[in-house]
């Protein structure tokens, strides 16, 4: 079994993270998932969540990751998502306002895309939870 994973996190705007890690914990549509070195090959869909990264040095990092795709093969882990942010990049006030708007839309379902409003709520909650 290999000692480390090669992790790459990509968004349309940037290469968010690239490095050797011991562990990654995130949320897939099937539930919480922990990826360790030697993990079996897998492709899964990710939910908006706070993702925990344990670097080779043992340093723990947390980041907001939006819905996306995770692929693990040959100890190379790739996460592709629309948005990825470090805690210092998140505007708490903006996230709380987005949460409030999404909750209002869901309460008055007339003429809205419920799935889109629910995804917006999930993104806002994940950002808020990461900062608390």
From Swiss-Prot:
InterPro entries: ATP_F1_dsu/esu_C_sf, ATP_synth_F1_dsu/esu, ATP_synth_F1_dsu/esu_N, ATP_synth_F1_esu_C, ATPsynth_dsu/esu_N
Keyword entries, A-Z: ATP synthesis, Cell membrane, CF(1), Hydrogen ion transport, Ion transport, Membrane, Transport
GO cellular component, one term: plasma membrane
Principal place of residence: membrane
A Pfam family hit: ATP-synt_DE_N
CDD domains: F1-ATPase_delta
Molecular functions per Gene Ontology: ATP binding; proton-transporting ATP synthase activity, rotational mechanism
Membrane topology note: Peripheral membrane protein
Extent of the signal sequence: none
Keyword Manganese: no
Disulphide linkage map: none
Protein purpose: Produces ATP from ADP in the presence of a proton gradient across the membrane.
Family statement drawn from the similarity comment of this UniProt entry: Belongs to the ATPase epsilon chain family.
Quaternary structure, from the entry: F-type ATPases have 2 components, CF(1) - the catalytic core - and CF(0) - the membrane proton channel. CF(1) has five subunits: alpha(3), beta(3), gamma(1), delta(1), epsilon(1). CF(0) has three main subunits: a, b and c.
Protein name: ATP synthase epsilon chain
The organism of origin for this protein: Clostridium kluyveri (strain ATCC 8527 / DSM 555 / NBRC 12016 / NCIMB 10680 / K1)
């Amino acid at each position: 079994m290999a000692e480390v994973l090669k992790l790459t996190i990509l968004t349309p705007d940037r290469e968010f993270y690239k490095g050797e890690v011991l562990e990654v914990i995130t949320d897939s549509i099937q539930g919480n998932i922990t990826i360790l070195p030697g993990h079996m090959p897998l492709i899964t869909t990710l939910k908006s969540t706070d993702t925990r990264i344990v670097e080779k040095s043992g340093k723990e990092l947390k980041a907001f990751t939006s819905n996306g795709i995770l692929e693990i093969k040959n100890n190379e882990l790739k996460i592709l998502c629309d948005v990825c942010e470090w805690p210092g990049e998140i505007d708490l006030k903006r996230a709380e306002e987005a949460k409030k708007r999404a909750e209002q839309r869901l309460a008055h379902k007339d003429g809205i895309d419920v799935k889109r409003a629910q995804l917006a709520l999930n993104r806002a909650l994940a950002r808020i939870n990461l900062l608390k």
